[in-house]
Structure formats: C-alpha cells, structure tokens
Amino acid sequence: MLRSSFTQSRQLLLSQARSRTAAQWLPKAGASNRLAGQRFFADAKPPVTGAPTPASPSSESSIPPETVPKPSPAAEAPLPPPPPPAPARKTGRFRKFLLYLILTSGFAYGGGIFLALKSDNFHDFFTEYVPYGEDCVLYFEERDFYRRFPNTLRNQNRAPKDEGHTVTIPSKSGLSWKVAEEESGADVSQKGPHMSALDNGDKAQLKPGAAKPEEKVATVEKVKAESAAKEQTAEDKKKVKEEPKKPAAPAVTPIEFATVSEGDEEVVQELVKTFNDIITVIGADENAHKFSGAVNKAKEELRTIGEKIIAIRNEARKAAQEEIKQAHATFDESARELIRRFEEARAHDAAQYREEFEAERERLARAYQEKVNTELQRAQEVAEQRLKNELVEQAIELNRKYLHEVKDLVEREREGRLSKLNELTANVNLLEKLTTDWKEVIDTNLKTQQLQVAVDAVRSVLERSTVPRPFVRELVAVKELAAGDPVVEAAIASINPTAYQRGIPSTSQIIERFRRVADEVRKASLLPEDAGIASHAASLVLSKVMFKKDAVAGSDDVESVLLRTEHLLEEGNLDDAAREMNTLKGWAKILSKDWLSDVRRVLEVKQALEVRLGPFTSLFHLYR
C-alpha cells in the first residue's frame, strides 16, 4: 500500500514537472526562432565534445550499481523539438540592380540634357533617338526661359487665344495692283487635246494578243466619245478667249501719307514708316477708297500717340530735372555735413596730437635730463677713481723707493760674510735639479733593465726550446713591466695569439720540416691544377727519375724555387725564404701552405721582438 501510494505521488509530481518544463521550453523555442534570423559575431558555435570528467574520491559512491533504482519511462522528460534552420539570407541582387539602373539612367539623362543644352548637334540626336528626351529638354529650356524673362508670367489676365477655328486664306484670293492682261499666245503647257492625246496613247498601250475582240470595240468607242467631248470644250474656250477686252478700271485716288512732325522718337518714326508702307499697299488697290476712313482714324490715333509720347517725355524730363535739383541739394547738404565733420575730426585730431606732442616732449626732456645727470654722476665717479688711482700709484712708488733705499743699506751691510748668500742659494737649487734628473734616469734605467730581462727571457724560450713551447707568462711579464706603454702594447698585439699560446718552431725545426715539404712539393711539381688520380701517380713516378739542377736566378720553376729557399734557410734568412715559397702556384703552393703559416708566425714574433722592442734594449745599453 505504501509503495503504491508512493508510486502514484511520484508519477503525479513527474507529470507536473513535465508540464512546467514544456511550458518553459515553448517561450525559449520562440526566442530561439526569433534570434535565428539575426546575425551575431558568433553564430556558429564550436561543437562541445563530451570529455569524460575524472572521478574524484569524494564522488565515488559506495552503493553498488545493481541496487540503484532505474528511472521509470514516465520520469524521462521529452526533449524539445530542434529549432528550425535559419532562413537563407536574401542577397538583394534585384534591388541592387534596380538601384544601379535608376542611378545610371538618371546620370545618363542628366548628362544628355546638359550636353543637349550646350550643343546643337547633340540636341538633335538626343531629342530624336532618346525616349522622352525632347520633353526633358523642352522642360529645362522653359525653366531657363522663365528664369531669364520672369515678366512673362505677369500678364496672365489677357484673353486666351481662340485656336479652335483656323482661318485659311487661299493663294491668289486677294486683289492685285496689276490690271489683268490676256495672254498673247497659246500656252502649250495647259491642258488640251494635245495633252489628252498623249494620255490616251499611254492608256491605250496594251498587248495585242491579250485583248479580246469585244474589249477592243468598247475601247475604240470610248476613245472616240472622249475625243469629241474634248474638242467641244476646246472650241468653247477659244470663243471665250476671242471676246474683246474690257476697259481698265479708273485710277484710284491715292491716300495721303501719315506725318507726325513732333515725333522725333525713333520708335514713332519707325511706326510712321510702317504705317506709310501699309498706306502705299492699300493705295495700290482698286478699293482703296473703302479704307480711307480707317486710315484717317489710324492717322489721328498715331498723331495722338506722338503727342502723348512728347507729353510723357516732357513730364519725364521735368521729373528728372526735379530729381537732379533735389540730388544737387542733397549732395550740397551732405558735402556741408561732411566738411563740418571733417573740420571737427581735424580739430579733435589736432588737439589730441598737440596733447601727445606735449606729453612726448615732456617725456623726452625728462629722459634727457636723467641721462645728463647720469653722465655727470659717472664722470664725477671716474674722476674720483682716477684721483684715487694716482694716489695709490704715488704711494706704491714711495714704498718702492723706500725698499730700494733699505736694500741698498742692507747690501752695504752684507759686504762682509753675507755677500755670497745668493750664489750659495743658486748652487743649492742647481744641485736639487741635478738630483731630480738623475733619479728619473735611474728609474728609467731600472725599468729598461727589467724589460730587457723579460725580453731576453722570451728570446731564450724561443731559441733554446727543441719543441714549440708557449711563452704566455713571459709576454705577460713584459706587458706588466711596460706599464701601459703604447709601443709595447702594439708589439704584443701584433703577435698572433696562436703563436704565444702554442709556441713557435725553432729555425732547425723549420729547416727540417722544409726538407720534408720540399720532397712532397717535388712529387707534385708536375701536377696541373685540375689533376686526377692518374696525374698524381704519373707525377710521383717522374719525380723519382728527375735530375736535380742548380738554382737559376729569375727562374720560377718549382725546383729552382726550392733550391733558392733552401740556401736562404741555411743562411738564416727566413723572410726571403718565405717570399720565395710564396711564389709557388698550384699544388705546390697548397702543400707548402702549412709551412708558410709557421714561418709567418715565427717572423711575426721576431719582428715584434727586434723591431718594436729593440729601442728599449738599445736605450738600456746606452744608459749602461
């Protein structure tokens, strides 16, 4: 019973927890769906690998896994559904294309309209081939026109034009000033029988084989009827032309021209001239008397207009004269006011300049007075100081005279045993000087002797050793005894460190090693620079059978160089022997390279001992 109730209560609790979990997951799922469409800096999270957590001693349980109750299937909460995949982001290519197309079209139309307004050729091309180009150009031209002529929009109260009914005046419908004259002869170009014959001939050109007999008969009858009708028409016209001429119309009384004597304006004269031309045209017409009333009325109006223009001009002249008089009065008043202001400003400036001048004059006078006082004070001080100096000089001169007199008196008193005190003092000073000089000579001699002993120790090590022996301690002793002398430092620095660390061979060792090297050089004397194994073998065999020859002066062959080097070594001239061996080339020089390096070290040491340390030894012999 207890178990069943416990199970039921557990299932109830699990169901409530499951409902709460589902209710909590729903808003979270909606939020994840809303956030899926947004972009953040870290949309794609790296996959989290489930690394095994190491078991700690505290986490280990003493309960065996068999006794742990397994969770019931109802206790497992269902997993929330996975969020839907993020929708694909729109690229907006069509919008970009449409935007670029609109911008490009706008720039193209704008540039085209600008060029069309500047160039006539491009204007024709743009308005003819570009859609809506003519409307755009007309719109901007109207805007430019209204900008240049803004008064065109003011007279909007005028009656609109009646463009609905168009009046057409046919040609040759008016009157002419010439009297109609009859033509003197026949005009061949007018229509008549001769023209109809040609037309009928063209119409009658048919294929003879293609026409039927009935059509031929009908065509002939039709042509006969037309020719008869045309002949009748020609006879009627001839009768009309043969009628007698009517008498000409009587001459029309000419209309007087309009004159405006007072109108000397150019516009009025042009208007009168135009009106007179119209009168001339009307007077040449037969019905000129019909227009005489209108012409006279126009003359009166023209004369009235001239009088009005003259009146307006007189009024404008009077108004201009009044304005000129008023401007003159205003100008005179302004000039008087300007002169008054100028006088006031000049008086004010003069007073100000006078005050400044007085102040500056007082300042300069005060400064000059101070300068004069300072100069007088300095001159007085200089004079007083000069007097003091003269008094001091006189006092010094008196003291000198007094001392001289006292000295003379003392010298007279010394004529006895104190007469040679000065000579004794001079001799004592000379002895002190000689003692000091000899002390320096003795110290230098002692130092030179010690240095000579150290140098002799180095030489004895080099000459008496049968094998190369290092002489580092001897060189250290020489360096310490030199006490920082630059010559000794340079001599020691010129020696190769390998020479005094490992030692140098003696002259006998150098000669002995030269003989061994000479044998090897003779074996390789016949080898070229790029010799192989066969060349080495051939050179070895030939060197055994070669005859030794005497050294020839100026010869640079291997045998001569070796002989000259051997003679120089026997004489003890290592420098010239090294120079001779250095002239070898090829394999001979390569084989003698080690021997040359040893000789070079020996020469460096000897040069340092003889050339650089030689002056110290000569100085020692000099003092000894």
From Swiss-Prot:
Keywords: Coiled coil, Membrane, Mitochondrion, Mitochondrion inner membrane, Transit peptide, Transmembrane, Transmembrane helix
Biased composition (Basic and acidic residues): 212-246
Residue spans, topological domain Mitochondrial matrix: 42-96
Transit peptide: 1-41
Cross-referenced Pfam families: Mitofilin
Mitochondrial intermembrane topology ranges: 118-624
GO biological process: cristae formation
UniProt superkingdom: Eukaryota
Pro residues compositional bias, start-end: 66-87
GO cellular component: MICOS complex
Coiled-coil blocks: 295-440
Primary residence: mitochondrion
Membrane topology: Single-pass membrane protein
Region ranges (Disordered): 42-89, 180-249
Cellular compartments annotated: Mitochondrion inner membrane
Transmembrane segments: 97-117
Record flagged with keyword Coiled coil: yes
Low complexity bias locations: 46-65
Family, similarity comment: Belongs to the MICOS complex subunit Mic60 family.
Subunit structure: Component of the mitochondrial contact site and cristae organizing system (MICOS) complex.
Purpose: Component of the MICOS complex, a large protein complex of the mitochondrial inner membrane that plays crucial roles in the maintenance of crista junctions, inner membrane architecture, and formation of contact sites to the outer membrane. Plays a role in keeping cristae membranes connected to the inner boundary membrane. Also promotes protein import via the mitochondrial intermembrane space assembly (MIA) pathway.
Protein name, per record: MICOS complex subunit mic60
Naturally occurring in which organism (per UniProt): Aspergillus fumigatus (strain ATCC MYA-4609 / CBS 101355 / FGSC A1100 / Af293)
